[in-house]
């Protein structure tokens, strides 16, 4: 994101809380280190972890435990309506059958950009306070080497500050971060381009991206030769929401609409943080609200 536009209070609430309680982020970090921790806090570590088999293992496990019959996949022509305090959701399933479900509650976790075509029963003026949220497009590049010969990638990786004027946003050392991500002696990197800093990267061809990555990666990691066995490019549209100065207005409108349409619960990365941990935390909160 663009640091000049991000509002700490919304984008980094934990840092903002430290600043409010202790006067500054640095002072707060130091003083909190001496503060007596609860038994639950003592269980928390800062160790980076993932899921065996990748994050799809997590969603697959949730899918199975929740009961596959609870899900309808491959739907189209989704049209929710709000009538007499109920949600009437019409759609076509994967067999092109027309189905209507009547529900007391409706939960959305899609991006803000899709709500105007999804929640058509809400007036455009109100929804625009939510759908005007900016998103950064990101290009993800995965590099894999069977026999790495360059700087030792022992660590997390790093973000690249804008002052360096590079075309990369950052590099993650995936094979150091997570176990069993590569064959024995293999090395895996994930690179990011684009974002609010370099939005033009998203529109570049794969050949252009490859040329940029080779130049930047060789400069950063100093391999004796650049011949990755794996070179994969993924384009992610609307990847990262930008919590700017209008965020407070957006959050207020979410609350207003949820009060106006009883049973409507609006989630997703348009509120509550942008990271994976934020999504898991919010998922539990939404489930508790829906069951309440």
What feature does the model see in each segment?
Residues 68, 103-104, 261:
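Active-site acidic short loop of glycosyltransferases
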């Amino acid at each position: 994101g663009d640091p000049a536009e991000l509002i700490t209070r919304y984008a980094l609430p934990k840092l903002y809380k430290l600043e409010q309680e202790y006067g500054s982020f640095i002072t707060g970090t130091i003083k909190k280190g001496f503060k007596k921790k609860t038994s639950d806090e003592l269980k928390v570590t800062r160790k980076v972890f993932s899921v065996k088999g990748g994050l799809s293992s997590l969603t697959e496990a949730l899918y199975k435990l929740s009961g596959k019959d609870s899900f309808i996949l491959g739907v189209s022509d989704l049209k929710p309506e709000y009538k007499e305090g109920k949600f009437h959701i019409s759609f076509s399933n994967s067999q092109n059958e027309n189905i209507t479900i009547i529900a007391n509650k409706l939960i959305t976790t899609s991006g803000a950009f899709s709500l105007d075509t999804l929640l058509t029963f809400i007036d455009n003026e109100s929804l625009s306070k939510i759908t005007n949220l900016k998103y950064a497009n990101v290009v993800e590049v995965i590099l894999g080497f069977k026999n790495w010969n360059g700087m030792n990638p022992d660590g997390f990786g790093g973000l690249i500050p804008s002052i360096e004027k590079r075309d990369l946003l950052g590099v993650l050392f995936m094979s150091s971060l997570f176990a069993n991500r590569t064959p024995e002696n293999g090395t895996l990197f994930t690179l990011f381009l684009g974002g609010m800093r370099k939005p033009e990267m998203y529109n570049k061809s794969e050949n252009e991206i490859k040329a940029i990555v080779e130049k930047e990666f060789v400069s950063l990691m100093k391999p004796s030769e650049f011949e990755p066995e794996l070179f994969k490019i993924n384009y992610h549209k609307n990847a990262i929401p930008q919590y700017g100065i209008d965020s407070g207005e957006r959050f207020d409108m979410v609350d207003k609409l949820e009060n106006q349409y009883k049973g409507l619960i609006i989630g997703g990365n348009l509120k509550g943080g942008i990271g994976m941990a934020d999504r898991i935390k919010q998922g539990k909160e939404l489930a508790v609200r829906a069951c309440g």
